[in-house]
Design a protein with these regions (language model features):
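Acidic/glycine-rich phosphate/pyrophosphate-binding loops and surrounding catalytic core
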Residues: 1-172, 176, 188-193, 220
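Glycine-rich beta-strand-to-loop/alpha-helix junction loops that act as flexible
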Residues: 179-180, 207-213
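C-terminal non-catalytic interaction appendages of large macromolecular assemblies
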Residues: 211-222
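Short acidic, glycine/proline-enriched helix-loop-strand junctions
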Residues: 196-206
């Protein structure tokens, strides 16, 4: 009913297939729809053929999938669009905090909308948070312990609350530094200082920020 990105076609197709239905898509996955520009406020996206009882069985589940994923893709599209308009050329990523049982679908919807899916689950990358650091005594020790049990291809991300912690994590060999719950201005200062501090010191790392970001204040962090 509102403008947005169509998403979830492959999953809806599986529902229709299992219900012995034929579907013809009139709009492609990832297309931006603008029903607000039509005379009746609607856009026909597909035609489904089959027995009435089978259509009724598939109707609600397929619509729920399309609505859920299209909503996520649309929000992702709006977010990355605003970031680009602010001049940001880096990556915008979703989180692992997805709806139970729907992670694959929701991560897919993020990608359709144009943002990165980040890690899929806990096995995708080591992330050291405050509890891990507290239990080992220091960021350096936590990273050392992690390196002992992971392969060379697995990255380590460390959540930090200050520049001091970030510098320790970089020195210890972290691949990604998450600046957590920084203010917009504080983030810019910390990021610039870290880049200057480690310039030409043979340390390669990504900076990531998380916490407190919304569409309304996104420009303050970029």
């Amino acid at each position: 009913k509102s403008d947005g990105v169509l998403s979830g076609v492959p999953f809806a197709n599986e529902v229709y297939n299992q219900c012995n239905l034929k579907v013809e898509w009139l709009i492609e996955e990832g297309d931006f729809l603008q029903p607000s520009l039509t005379t009746n406020g609607k856009i026909e996206i597909a035609k489904v053929e089959g027995k009435v009882k089978d259509i009724l069985v598939a109707e609600r589940l397929s619509l729920n999938i399309l609505c859920r994923l299209s909503g996520i893709s649309t929000q992702s599209y709006i977010t990355i669009k605003k970031a680009r308009e602010c001049g940001y050329k880096g990556i915008i990523a979703g989180t692992r905090k997805t709806t139970p049982g729907l992670r694959l679908l929701e991560k897919y919807a993020m990608l359709v909308g144009g943002i990165d899916a980040h890690r899929f689950d806990l096995s995708s990358m080591i992330m050291l948070k405050d509890n891990h650091i507290w239990s080992t005594g220091s960021i350096t020790k936590a990273i050392e312990n992690a390196k002992k049990v992971i392969g060379f291809s697995t990255k380590i991300e460390v959540e930090v609350q200050s520049e001091e912690e970030a510098n320790e994590a970089i020195e210890a060999g972290a691949d990604i530094i998450m600046l957590d719950n920084f203010t917009g201005e504080g983030l810019k200062i910390a990021a610039n200082n870290l880049k200057k501090n480690w310039l030409n010191k043979n340390k390669n790392f990504y900076l990531e920020c998380s916490g407190g970001l919304t569409l309304d204040n996104l420009d303050q962090f970029l």
